[in-house]
Amino acid sequence: MNNALNQLQPYPFEKLRALLGSVTPNPDKRPIALSIGEPKHRSPSFVAEALANNLDQMAVYPTTLGIPALREAIAGWCERRFGVPSGWIDPARNVLPVNGTREALFAFTQTVVNRSDDALVVSPNPFYQIYEGAAFLAGAKPHYLPCLDENGFNPDFDAVSPDIWKRCQILFLCSPGNPTGALIPVDTLKKLIALADEYD
């Protein structure tokens, strides 16, 4: 059994559910759930129709990498959405459909972290819970960068020592931040890319 399992914290949404379990919302107000990012809108009709027309395929495992048409559609959307040149994103090499970000972030961390006594996974704090769990189970220690009001709720990357950067195997970033909503300035992203090149 992986000894790192003992380091895992209860998932925050379970804590939140327990805290809110005895709360009775004001009946005159509609509560706004600020927890799990589940879609609150109806699925588009073409999606519902496609699912209904393919119910006989629901018990069939998908291909490991997803069907080529899906990967091509995702690559095309990314190119349009982010303005990258056509063909820049290779659907066969750069796209992997997954069942949510937790699956992808966890698998990525297990793949790239080289277990060692000084391995660090650096993340903002507050953070998306999978960052910490993936770090522990990959044999690394989480290193938290506080997201404070005086920094616009972004980490102060200038305060990170060279020793931390040397030991950093993954830096988790999310813009807008989860859960703060803070945007990371482009100049900061460029600086972080330069640091990754320097310390890799």
Regions picked out by a protein language model, each given a short descriptive name:
Residues 59-198:
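Conserved core of the PLP fold type I
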Residues 2, 6-100:
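N-terminal small-domain helix-loop-helix segment of the aminotransferase-like
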Residues 1-4, 15, 167-169, 191:
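Terminal low-complexity, poorly structured segments
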